[in-house]
Amino acid sequence: MYLEVSERQVLDASDFAFLLENSTSPYDYGENESDFSDSPPCPQDFSLNFDRTFLPALYSLLFLLGLLGNGAVAAVLLSQRTALSSTDTFLLHLAVADVLLVLTLPLWAVDAAVQWVFGPGLCKVAGALFNINFYAGAFLLACISFDRYLSIVHATQIYRRDPRVRVALTCIVVWGLCLLFALPDFIYLSANYDQRLNATHCQYNFPQVGRTALRVLQLVAGFLLPLLVMAYCYAHILAVLLVSRGQRRFRAMRLVVVVVAAFAVCWTPYHLVVLVDILMDVGVLARNCGRESHVDVAKSVTSGMGYMHCCLNPLLYAFVGVKFREQMWMLFTRLGRSDQRGPQRQPSSSRRESSWSETTEASYLGL
């Protein structure tokens, strides 16, 4: 959240590894003396006090909810792992990504409340891990959307031949791209001592141009492109489902709308604030201390809304997805009868079929 006057711009990563926007000075500290402004950096008391109070409480709550909710989703899917469709497999990877993301939240809660006490190595790992799973969540939702689009709109199953191999390769590509986008975290993140704060924080050592370019990349690749893919695919899916008949199809349509709307509602406010900050960086909008303080607080609040998306998907499955509730109940029943010879309520072959390539019925989670 701060800039250190040096040959390189140093950014605090208290808003996590992928949030490079919390620059609190309007001045570009370059390598040349002429780059320095005669005015001092903006005071940070208001935004700092807000972050120290708001972020640790929020991150702790999201950690508990996200771990329990996504753990339940993973348990349900793994209990049916021999009959998972392509959508179910993507959802399993999405739950894993959300779990790994929320596991970093306690570290960043400590960083926001006190300082970074976990060393430079864990700084790089935690920052990269958060960034990897931020991208993975968006990319996997886009994969689910495209898979449903082909299966419903074009009646095409791209995973019909060797489905597990093809789905696995798709997931490997997704995780590989996420790792590629997280390389700046491994390179530029470090635990740096900030003299103005008298504290050590997990920070980026970034030149201004690199900071702006990476934030634009994250805005486009991590939000706009996945959102456009989801909107396009689900708009065509809804067009097909609306002309169909049957209550089952309308239940599937309802959850489709809710899932894509949740992604948009959770992440749009944050990325709009980031866009404003980018426009101030490039000089399109004037930067002053009052506006900068408001933007910093807005980023803390809206980023919290974005992180809530990790906890929201399991709730959507539970309250909107009928099949998820059924499978969760069956899992609890089997666990309660583990001392018996076997579960008495195994789903029939017709109920176990979850791929939309053969039917518009939802997967195990109702998608």
UniProtKB/Swiss-Prot annotation:
A GO BP entry: G protein-coupled receptor signaling pathway
**Top-rank lineage group of the source organism:** Eukaryota
**Keywords, sorted A to Z:** Angiogenesis, Cell membrane, Chemotaxis, Disulfide bond, G-protein coupled receptor, Glycoprotein, Membrane, Receptor, Sulfation, Transducer, Transmembrane, Transmembrane helix
Question: What does the UniProt PTM comment say about this protein?
Answer: Sulfation on Tyr-27 and Tyr-29 is essential for CXCL10 binding. N-glycosylated.
Could you tell me one molecular function GO term of this UniProt entry?
Answer: C-X-C chemokine binding
For this UniProt entry, which segments traverse the membrane? 53-79, 89-109, 125-146, 169-188, 212-232, 255-276, 298-320
- Kindly list every residue the record annotates as glycosylated: 22, 32
Naming one, the record's GO cellular component terms include: external side of plasma membrane
Could you tell me in which tissues this protein is expressed? Answer: Expresses in lymphoid organs and Th1 cells.
Q: Where in the cell is it found?
A: Cell membrane
Q: Which residues carry this modification: Sulfotyrosine?
A: 27, 29
Its record classes its membrane topology as: Multi-pass membrane protein
Cytoplasmic topological domain residue ranges: 80-88, 147-168, 233-254, 321-367
Chain ranges on the Extracellular side, renumbered to this chain: 1-52, 110-124, 189-211, 277-297
Q: Give the span(s) annotated as Disordered.
A: 338-367
Which Pfam family would be a valid example here?
Answer: 7tm_1
Give me the disulphide-bonded residues.
Answer: 123-202
Q: Which InterPro entries match?
A: CCR1-9-like, Chemokine_CXCR3, Chemokine_rcpt, GPCR_Rhodpsn, GPCR_Rhodpsn_7TM
Assembly and partners are described as: Homomer. Forms heteromers with ACKR4. Interacts with PF4/CXCL4.
> What PANTHER family does its record include?
C-X-C CHEMOKINE RECEPTOR TYPE 3 (PTHR10489:SF671), CELL ADHESION MOLECULE (PTHR10489)
Q: Which family does it belong to?
A: Belongs to the G-protein coupled receptor 1 family.
- Function, in words: Receptor for the C-X-C chemokine CXCL9, CXCL10 and CXCL11 and mediates the proliferation, survival and angiogenic activity of mesangial cells through a heterotrimeric G-protein signaling pathway. Probably promotes cell chemotaxis response. Binds to CCL21. Upon activation by PF4, induces activated T-lymphocytes migration mediated via downstream Ras/extracellular signal-regulated kinase (ERK) signaling.
Which named protein is this? C-X-C chemokine receptor type 3
Q: What organism does the UniProt record list as the source? A: Mus musculus
